Amino acid sequence: MNKPSIAALLLFSLISISGMNKVQAQNLQLYYDAGRGCATSTVEMFRPDAGGSTFFFIDFDYSPKVSGAYWEIARELNFWQDSKVNWLSVHLEYNGGLNVGTAFNNAFLGGLTYSGHSKDFTKTWSLSAMYKAIPGTFDASGKCQMHNFQITGVWGIEFAKGWCTFSGFADFWREHRTWQGTEFIFMTEPQFWVNLNKVKGWENIHLSVGGELELSANFVAKGFHAMPAAGAKWTF
């Protein structure tokens, strides 16, 4: 599964906080995941409003039939967009899914997000600290361990006069996985995109090509893993 372009969510959230609350975005991403040997599609939607913003994404894995599904929906609450603390928002999130033979535990998150940006919005960043409830999680002794935490950092950088975008996220969270004897998980997915709407005559072609590199510890399996994926993204 691919994590969404949360950096895009951050960018649009910051724009909406700055008063441009009519901004909204949807995109479709297609990847070939060389590490897993499968294809992945991702649909994302972002929409701001007077009280904050809503974002969701849905992933499907294909190998070649649908072999997995995963989704997240997040709400940023910010009723104080005109105040001096509009950089702070309340974050609420749900995620869950399944693949062949098993299902991911439902996860419910809540916490605070700090967001920042450069004057021209070509550089954006955020840091979220969240409580994470994962019902049905137990440690090796059989004790329920549903109460956990997650820290998420997000960045987005647009450069080369808008031709290129470097974005991504880094997650660190606690989740007991008795089958592999681990308790903490780290994952980051830096993405690089070339934006083809900068080609002369292609201004209305909202296509980007590039990909991502998933780096994780104790996520796919115990230990460190690197999984590159080539992709294309259409924004509409």
Name the predicted role of every residue range.
Residues L30-R36, F60-P64, L92-L98, A129-P135, ...:
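Transmembrane beta-strands of outer-membrane beta-barrel pores
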Residues M1-A25:
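Cleavable N-terminal export/targeting peptides
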Residues K22-Q24, G51-S53, N78-V90, H117-S126, ...:
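Short loop/turn motifs that connect adjacent beta-strands in outer-membrane beta-barrel proteins
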Residues K22-P64:
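Short glycine/proline- and aromatic-enriched beta-strand/turn motifs that initiate or cap beta-hairpins
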Residues K132-S208, E214-N218, W234-F236:
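Outer-membrane beta-barrel transmembrane domain signature
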Residues V43, W71-I73, G110-L112, I151-W155, ...:
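Membrane-embedded beta-strands of outer-membrane beta-barrel proteins
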Residues F224-F236:
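Outer-membrane beta-barrel "beta-signal"
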